[in-house]
Amino acid sequence: MELFFRKIGNGAPLIVLHGLYGASDNWITIAKHLAEDYTVYLLDQRNHGRSPFAGSHTYDDLLTDLADFFTQQKIDKATLLGHSMGGKIAMWFAAHFPEKTEKLIVADIAPKDYLPEKNDSSFNLHQNILLAMQEIDFLLVNSRNDVDNFLEEKIDDVRIRRFLLTNIVKDRLTKQYKWRINAAVLYDYLDEIVSGVNKNRLKQKAPITGYPVTFIRGTKSNYILPEDKILIKEIYPDAKIIDIPDAGHWLHAEQPEKFIKAVLE
C-alpha cells in the first residue's frame, strides 16, 4: 500500500503518525516548526485521509504499511513521533526495526492493553462515533453544518464534532460530501485498535534500550495514568517522560508550543 504523505523541511527524517480520526492535515502547524530541524513526513494512515481504504486495520497491517513507506522513500533511519493510535504503531515498528529507529516519541498513549477498559465511557464513545458516522445519508447533506446537526444528536462534545468535521470532503465527480475515514472497517476493528500494542506483546523484546525514548503526557488526559509510568519504565528503562500541564489527549493541539519543546528535548 502506498500511503499519502506530506514532506516538509530539510534534515534528518522524522515521521509523524496521527491517531484515530486524524490525518496529516492536523499536524501541518507542528510540522512547520519541527521542519527547522528535520525533514518531516506527515502520513495519512490506511483508512484515513487521502490514503487508500482497506478491509482490515490491525497493528500488523499498519506496521507493514510503515515498513513499506521506509522502503518506498528510501529512508534508512528515522525519528518516529506517534500520537495515540499512531504512538502504538510507532512502538510496534520500533520494536521490530530498532535499526531503523533513530528515536521514539510517543504522545499520550501507554504500552498497555486498553481493552479491559472497553466498558468505560471512552470505548463507548468511539463506538458511538463510528456508528454515527455510518448512519449519515450524504444524499441528504448539503453542507458540513447538516452533518454537525446530525452528529449533535449522538455526540455532545462540540470539540469532537469539530474534529470529525475536518474529515468531510466533497467528491470531485459526484460533488457529494463524504467521509475520508473508513468508519465501517474502523468499527469492525475497534477492539484491535483499542487493545493495540501492550506490555505482553512488547515484553518479548523488552527491556528496550536500543534507541532514545520519550513519552509526552497531557496531565488532563487519562490515557497515561501515574501508574503507567512504572509500566513504561519496565519496558523502556531509559525513557524520558514529560508532562504537559493543562493539556488533554490532543495535547499537540491544546499546547502546541510546549509540545514542540518536548519533542525537541
Regions found by a protein language model. Name each.
Residues 15-19, 83, 217:
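The conserved beta1-alpha1 loop
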Residues 138-192:
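Conserved alpha/beta-hydrolase catalytic His-Asp/Glu region
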Residues 244-260:
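Catalytic histidine-centered segment of alpha/beta-hydrolase-like enzymes
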Residues 32, 41-85, 89, 96, ...:
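Active-site loop/oxyanion-hole signature of alpha/beta-hydrolase fold enzymes
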Residues 171-235, 240-243:
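Conserved serine/cysteine hydrolase catalytic core
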Residues 4-53:
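Conserved HGGG/HGGXW glycine-rich cap/lid loop of the alpha/beta-hydrolase fold
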Residues 92-95, 101-144:
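Flexible "cap/lid" loop of the alpha/beta hydrolase fold
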Residues 1-15, 35-38, 75-77, 236-237, ...:
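Alpha/beta-hydrolase fold catalytic core
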